[in-house]
Regions:
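Short, Asp-centered acidic motifs that coordinate Mg2+ and/or phosphate
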Residues: 8, 43-44, 133, 167-169, ...
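Conserved beta strand-loop-helix elements of the APE1-like EEP
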Residues: 74-77, 90-105, 205-220
Length: 230
């Protein structure tokens, strides 16, 4: 099955709700993100902190897209899958996946560890040239102990829903400043580039390595961090 896939390009990106900065000085970045996402040329784009809608931001920014951010960012011909992680006073946000390939199924798993952080996993099953591919989009918590428990929930979900012989990608914002989750992920057969570390946060001057792509049943060929305004 894997040989039929040839190569697959996967991107993970925390878009921070399509806005740069906080408070009165914040500015709308979703249109720049559209150019970035379409410029990736990726087969699969895993997104975190994606707004389904937000009434406050819609009133503030004149050019706020009418569509949800996942649909807005999807390149022509791609399918967009979005599921909510957090519901707020003015709207909601969560994880999304944009796929060049047909979507066979999807699911969402709440992995919130405490009431101050709402976190989730988006599990999407794709048909890549007739072969199944599972992709899990993850956004883990800010506290290390929470992340450890959330990784165990990832493992339990994989055991229930992903056959061991079917290729798997788990990608997203792990908030893992070191490589403290690697061993736990490896226990589920998930591997990443062990000896290559690229800083990914903050995007304009990356200093920390928070974003990861793990794989099982696939062989990583190369890794890079795109550079630009975002």
């Amino acid at each position: 099955m894997i040989s039929r896939m040839s190569s697959l390009r996967v991107v993970t990106y925390n878009i921070h709700k399509g806005v740069q900065g906080l408070g009165p000085a914040s500015r709308l970045e979703i249109h720049n993100l559209l150019q970035a996402v379409q410029g990736f040329g990726a087969d699969v784009v895993c997104l975190q902190e994606v707004r389904g809608f937000n009434r406050q931001m819609q009133k503030r920014f004149a050019h706020w897209p009418a569509a949800g951010q996942a649909d807005y960012l999807a390149p022509p011909g791609y399918q967009a899958v979005y599921r909510t992680n957090a519901v707020t006073r003015h709207g909601e946000h969560g994880n999304a996946l944009l796929s060049r390939w047909p979507v066979l199924g999807q699911g969402h798993h709440d992995v919130s560890d405490h009431r101050f952080e709402q976190r989730g996993l988006l599990h999407v099953r794709l048909d890549v040239k007739g072969a199944p591919l599972h992709v899990v989009v993850a956004h883990l918590g800010l506290i290390h102990a929470s992340r450890e428990r959330q990784v165990q929930q990832i493992g339990a979900m994989l055991e229930r829903e992903v056959p061991p012989h079917e290729p798997l990608v788990v990608a997203g914002d792990f908030n893992d400043w070191g490589q403290r989750l690697h061993d736990a992920m490896a226990a589920f057969g998930l591997r990443t580039f062990e000896h290559i570390r690229h800083a990914t946060y903050p995007s304009r001057l990356p200093l920390l390595h928070l974003d990861r792509i793990y794989a099982r049943g696939l062989r990583p060929l190369s890794v890079q961090v795109p550079h630009g305004g975002q």
